[in-house]
């Protein structure tokens, strides 16, 4: 089933020329097809005895170093990943319970407020060695450093890190630095000048003034293989005052009888946003209308990113069970849309959009998946059930899995080691 289209009043675009398109609608009828028990779209169970890559920090969103076509790269034989990172506080009185024991669950839940961008390096594509922070304290203009994408620009080792500056506000930003390698390891240097690129505009994307719990983050830049221009996808919410959106015929889709009542679904207004750069330097950007909207379906379309394969545009995003609209449900995991052109139209993969979800018996085992062009999918471990109602907190890399993309469908294949993120190409610095 082809997802619907939602009309936007597109104002003239200075940088984008004559680009004209309507966003694809991920409809409620599409989402009703989500099947949490389909083995072809279910991630294998993660064992509760998983290893932890660090006893001193939590990690979650993982960002492999890559090029603008999506190729995951190593540099002089060293693989590099960036992660959202926060210190663990086993001895902090704030995180000790009444019996003096470390409350790791509360520490984990509080991590977002102290998120920092850190890096790791490896000769093997696993067995990651902690490198430290990318930006020194005080370089980023906000209190939180949230997810984005590190791009290797050339064989001189220059890197553009696109990321999200959060609190106060939320802005897409970038900072340029460089990678230096030796036989002993890797250093990321000179990430000292942050440039804010753009914020939500209230025309295409919801602002904080329109909705205090708005989403605007997770930049992922790429070169369109067809026109050679530099674009960026990101997470947003469809513009408009909270509660003012209409779940109309396009948003409903061809639902079966009895599913016309959407309750409070107008509050879920997620979308995958798009921007275009003036040139390949990525210094000046213009916001475009969303590529995919999820009004009445889901409020979060986090960490969108592309895989280009077989002449198709595979657009992936991640979302949660708890952000689905009333009357709908689906697992935490990867959702995807596929089309033949950057501007759509797109079709929800596997008819529903679900590509790789957590198993029902372990609904929170992994999150923040990143699909790489070689079909490998990385994620982090959130929490895995143990005995009774208890569970074990992760804050570490999950086992990597591979998915097979076949037209509009996807199939789970092999499972690999924890945090296995091999380079697809090695770049030798000049």
From Swiss-Prot:
Query: What keywords are annotated for this sequence in UniProt?
Result: Carbohydrate metabolism, Glycosyltransferase, Transferase
First-tier enzyme category under EC: transferase
Task: Locate the residues binding sucrose.
Answer: 60-61, 147, 217-218
Q: How does activity depend on pH?
A: For sucrose hydrolase activity, shows the maximal activity in the 5-7 pH range, while the activity decreases at pH values lower that 5 and higher than 8. Levan polymerization occurs mainly at pH 5.0.
Describe how its activity is regulated. Answer: Sucrose hydrolase activity is negatively affected by salt concentration. The levan polymerization rate increases sharply in relation to sucrose concentration reaching the maximum at 100 mM sucrose, and then steadily decreases, suggesting a strong inhibition of the activity by the substrate.
The family database entries (Gene3D superfamilies) matched by this protein are listed as:
Glycosyl hydrolase domain, family 43 (2.115.10.20)
Q: Where is this site: Transition state stabilizer?
A: 218
As its record notes, the protein acts as a catalyst of: [6)-beta-D-fructofuranosyl-(2->](n) alpha-D-glucopyranoside + sucrose = [6)-beta-D-fructofuranosyl-(2->](n+1) alpha-D-glucopyranoside + D-glucose
What turns on expression? Expressed both in presence and absence of sucrose in the medium. The expression level does not change in a significant manner during growth.
Q: How does activity depend on temperature?
A: Highly thermostable. At pH 5.0 and pH 7.0, sucrose hydrolase activity progressively increases with temperature until 55 degrees Celsius and then falls quickly.
Question: Which spans of this chain does the record mark as coiled coil?
Answer: none
Quaternary structure (record): Homodimer.
Protein function: Catalyzes the synthesis of levan, a fructose polymer, by transferring the fructosyl moiety from sucrose to a growing acceptor molecule. Also displays sucrose hydrolase activity. Can depolymerize the levan produced once substrate is completely exhausted.
What family is reported?
Answer: Belongs to the glycosyl hydrolase 68 family.
Task: Report the protein name in the record.
Answer: Levansucrase Lscgamma
Gene encoding this polypeptide? lscgamma
